[in-house]
Amino acid sequence: MVRAQETVYDLITKCSVRRVPPKQFVNFYNEFFNERYDSVLENGNPAGESRPTAPVYEEVAQDLVRILNDSRVNLVADYVLEIVLINLNVDLLRLFLPKLHHVRNVMLLVHLFSRATAFISGLDNKLLAEQISDTVYTDVTPAVLSFNMQAIDDQLVIVLAKFLHAVLRLPEGQQKMGSVPTKQKAATLLQRLSTIDRLLYKRFIADLDGKLRLSGAPADMSFPLPPSNMPSPSVTSPKYETSSVGVMKRSTSMSNEAKYQDIKLARYYKNLWLNNKIHYCTVSDPLFLEKYDSILELATGGGLSADRPVKAKIADLVETAFTCFAQFVSNKLYHQSNSNFSLLERKWTVFVTKQLPLIIKSSIPDKTDIVLRTLENIDDKVIKAIKSYNTEKEEVKNRTEDLFDDYPVNSLDIRHEFLKNLIMMGLQPPTVLNEYLREDQMVDLKSLVTSEHLIIDNSQGVRETILNVRNFITKSIESLEFENLFDDGNQLLVTNDHGIIQIAHNLETISPTKQLEIANILYDLLSAAIESLDHKTISKVLTILTLNVGHLLTNIFCLTGYEKFARAVIRFIDVIWESNKSKSNDMVSDDSEFENINSAMAYTLSLCFIIHVVDIYGVNVEALVENPSKSTVLRFLSKLGEIPEVFVAPEGDLESSKTLLQQWLRELFVKNLISDNLMKSADVKVMGFMIPFIFKQTLLNVEYGIISDISSFVNGFEYFLQPFLSVGLINIVFWLEKYLLALKTTESFPKINGALFDILGAIIAPKSIGSDAKAIHSVVLKLKCVGLLKELKSFQVPSESNYGIYSSQTRQDPRLEALISKLELIAQSSALYDVDPRIISAVNNNYSQKHISYNKVVLTSDIPINKIMTNQINSFWNLHSSTYYNFDYLLELIDLVTPFKFVQDVFQTLKYKVTAYGVPGSATKPSSAALDQVLGYVFYFMVLRDIKCPEEKSLLLEYLDSGRFPSSISATVLTSDPTTISGMPPVSMPYDVKSEQDAMEGVDEDFDMLFGESFSGLPDDVQKSADMKPDTGIKEDDSEKSSYVSAARLTESFGVIFSKMKKDKLEAYQAGQISEERYQCFMGLYDKYVQTLRHSVI
């Protein structure tokens, strides 16, 4: 029962501390309200008449106003919005709104009205819209106009106007405005708005004229016109810029330059935001187009462009997309020869060719003529950059040993692929391709796919149209057999004509709508299989996805985001598997043998999938688990690459673990035969830790000379490839990379190299392997093939020079050669990203060439990190905004130098250069405004790196205001240690684990070091348990889910760095160590960052 003295104020306070999601808060509120006030309502009216609600809602309204004044947590405003407007309570709304002008907390008021505006704008519930519209003239408008329009903050003026702009569209017809004071307040609001936001002013006064009759206003009260000299910011790119009489009248070059910089900054913000959304696979956001179009506010301080025609928005997006892509590939081609990035390029290709057509179809399906006009108006420099990039790619693809060998040049580029997809979707006629190509190249129209239908080649070689895609995919997965996926050498068959494999290899010819449908079908199949424990289907789907056949997984993540797939697989291991573990352990009959194998495969492949999406796509797993303190996934990943000196089974004690270990050692290496009972009772979760322990101890004993005859061990290791034991291979390959790196520096290697290669051959390049084990073996090796290749190739011995001529030919142990060949084949058959192209190329060029790099950014004596940073900062100073567009490159660079040093170097150098030389290309002399101009680009990049979702934005702003995170958010101390700085370090990063107990207590900390980065761009529904860290943490509540934000992500942000620098600068200033001018200079930078963060579009 609720105690009598508890109030709504108390409820909101407690829920905000716990970070309870707004939707869940409503349930708590309803329960609280029923228990707290039902008796009051009933007792107040025993006659059974209508219940007296006014006193009750008056008390609730006062509590809401009080909490809005007292709290600094944006979540509180979300709660208020839920119970007043979203779950509409007209009685409460009529009592609450008139009290809002008493709230002095501007931050929460702005957040409240912003969220309310977004809700009203997207309202599609007709009944609710009618109910709200009934209150617009009688309650909402008078309440909003009751604010002191002369005294309130500019930002609050804007959000109030936007809110009224949205709600006045709900009712039909005109309504006479109430009293003269109300009209005067409306006039005051318009007066303020005309000096703050001209575009919004024009739309708002149109609303008042159309919805409210103003003819009865006093004669001396006239609605102000906007200042004629107020610039009207461009709503799109420079090509779509509209002229303004006021702008034309400005004759000074400084005004023209300021306008040009506004246009340039607006375009830059759009481009960088677009790169950010593509990089983090969040283009599938339903509000993508609206958010993109609202970025203008951030750059110019102008009003919303919500009233702009959808055609204009699409035209702007198409033009910006191709311009941004051209700048991206041009910068990559000419300025980043020292890097090996390819994943973002692939995502960009998917966005332009597949996602952009989907956005067009959902927005203007019948008005796509604007798209072709936009393409034709693209700047010639953009077209030239795209053509140059396409030519370079074709040359690399067709390059041969013969210098005189000619090859056909394909003049089709990404623009034409974009048009082909529009043609597939019926948004353009086939003839448009040749019309657009004109002099470039003619295309046989009969060869074009002009239908959205899925078309495949059946087993008879006949092209077949698939009408029921779901049924086709389902049957394709059911009939898929692992032995048909791989050849005798355990290599993935590229020429496989099986349904789902054929689809994966022909994604370019499949329409965007069908690709999205296929992605959703695969998710549905995976989810259904997880819920029903269909281990075979889970294994098949995850094998195809983890191997990324034909870049299928990348396309799926681009189209749908990665959160739902990752969350489903994590739930399988943490929840479904654990809840059915006892049943699995009881399966010891002969009939259960195959089911045990299937379940072990599903478990192992699920872990591999999770590791793969974290390592390649930067998925923040910690934000997706339901119960961090009990998560098997978190525990496994936090120890990835670490094998303890003493084996203790999960959920077991030392003695029982010792007995189990001895039993397996006897079966593996003495009897060389695993009994049926031991096989059937094997717990795959335990095997994941025991098998790596056995492997490590064997290698160490061989290295120390304790074991000399390895034949029995080699034979025993062959069992590690069996599906029920292969889970141990995961930790083995991650630990092995570090072990080989350390082994090179020891004196024991020459003595044991033969034995070492024999042992490695048993698990990496076995002579034979079962059909069921092929899939797991290939998937596990893919996770670390590049790292293992790097270390194994370092054992190669270069041959002596031949007559003074250098040769890269090597003489090596044939067993080592077999290991390297196997890993090279794995790399070549896998869709790997961000690696040297020669690693994944089947072409073997034995001529002298530069060394293969195994890092994303190549650092040499000729190109050290200092030189790279100098070039990057010079690009910032030159306002070469395209240098920001290679988001992946910049993130890696920041990780290399650490965020703190990046901030220091960038700001110190930029301040010096701008002060000494001004801004390149500017006609004006260096000024304080020049530094702001340069930093406008830098700050927006920093903000987009810092925050991935609205929750992180709110929490970071709270931290900057109060100097601390809420007690419910687990926060770690900011460090300059590069292993804990933003970006996802390799999953093989070594840890300092002192004991098994220490590791258990530090699961969360270790995991943040590995996977602290979050790229989801979406709210994370999970809570962190308080018992994972003794100092800080979230209170555990198994029954609830909450929006979870990784502490490591926030503490590694530039915002936290600025906050700590602010504190240090203030202490230094107060101690007289720095001048007031220097302190104020820093505070200007700090305020600029906070302002950019506060107004940023996520």
UniProtKB/Swiss-Prot annotation:
The keyword Ribonucleoprotein does not apply. GO terms for cellular component: core mediator complex; mediator complex. One of its GO terms (biological process) is positive regulation of transcription elongation by RNA polymerase II. Pfam families: Med5. Its main location: nucleus. Residues 1021-1041 have a biased composition (Basic and acidic residues). Residues 1019-1041 are annotated as: Disordered. Keywords: Activator, Nucleus, Transcription, Transcription regulation. Component of the Mediator complex, a coactivator involved in the regulated transcription of nearly all RNA polymerase II-dependent genes. Mediator functions as a bridge to convey information from gene-specific regulatory proteins to the basal RNA polymerase II transcription machinery. Mediator is recruited to promoters by direct interactions with regulatory proteins and serves as a scaffold for the assembly of a functional preinitiation complex with RNA polymerase II and the general transcription factors. Component of the Mediator complex. Belongs to the Mediator complex subunit 5 family. This is Mediator of RNA polymerase II transcription subunit 5. It comes from Eremothecium gossypii (strain ATCC 10895 / CBS 109.51 / FGSC 9923 / NRRL Y-1056).
